[in-house]
């Protein structure tokens, strides 16, 4: 994931910064507890495509 792109991307719902999880290839919104997938190098920033993170799943960084 391009670091410059990460600097400008925000959560489409709450506008919070996103964390990049390389192993899962996802962008994480800590505020909304959503994981947005990255497919073929393209972040899919649609709420319907996001995975809701369970409360017990730790979000680090």
From Swiss-Prot:
GO terms for cellular component: cytosol. It holds the Pfam family Trm112p. It comes from the Bacteria. HAMAP family: UPF0434 (MF_01187). Belongs to the UPF0434 family. This is UPF0434 protein Nmul_A1027. It comes from Nitrosospira multiformis (strain ATCC 25196 / NCIMB 11849 / C 71).
